[in-house]
Amino acid sequence: MLIAIKTLLHTLLLPPGALLLLATAGAYLIARRGAGVRARRTGWALLAAGLATLWLLAIPLVSDALGRVAQRCPPLDLTRPVEAQAIVILGGAAGRLGAPEYGGEPAASQRLLERINYGGFLARRTGLPVAVSGTPTETLAMSASRARDFGVRTRWVEDRSRDTFENAQFCAQLFAPLGVTRIVLVTSADHEWRAMQEFVGAGFSVVPAPVGLYVPPEMGPHSFLPNVAALAYSTAALYEILGDLARQVFAALHLRRHPR
């Protein structure tokens, strides 16, 4: 139930859905028969606010600023030895169970593949064993892709988790009998900070290993022109900012607590 509520809130609070709903409400007030002057003014204000905010989130100038807020973990320093017992790669970007281009084998999504690639790179560089954590679809895609495309085997699979909180909780249960408490945590750069807080809360010592760090282009006239990539990046950044805020609220109200 909580996952379903979260999914609904994501649709209602994040662009473009939230802003399109706002603009649609404004258009309805404007076009409604018998609408008074005040209702029409409110409608125009809602329509303008929805479209203007959508435009702002779709320009690189704004998406870059949001990205800097969301990406709070620096890249892993590869010049220093990594003090950890395992590498944990998080899901969160579901792949496909039957990809026709791979002869029906599982395949990872682009965002998930980025995490797998970096996790494999770190595994080869450090010699540490690898765990994958996510839904059954995500973990199957990750395990298949790692073995097929990168030649790195997965030692542990945690396939019960549906969100970041459960990633941390179920990984703690998986590793407790093994005495594994120090991990390298591989996930997308905008997700790393929130994920790290959840894993620390579950009792882990975490070495953050963000991947896909955004490097903003040079500012110019194009920085004020909307594009789909900037809107997608703004949406991802807002998702993580709101997700971390929700994590703090849940923790303060003791709604979700890691068993220790």
Summary of predicted features, one role per range:
Residues M1-L9, V62, L66-A70, L238-L245, ...:
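Hydrophobic alpha-helical segments of integral membrane proteins
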Residues R32-T42:
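Membrane-interface helix-boundary motifs at transmembrane edges
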Residues P221, L225, L245-R260:
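Extracytoplasmic/luminal low-complexity segments enriched in Pro/Gly and acidic/polar residues
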Residues D159, A232-A236, G243-A246, R257-R260:
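Secreted/periplasmic serine-hydrolase-like ester/acetyl group-modifying domain
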Residues T24-Y28, G43, G50:
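Small-residue hotspots
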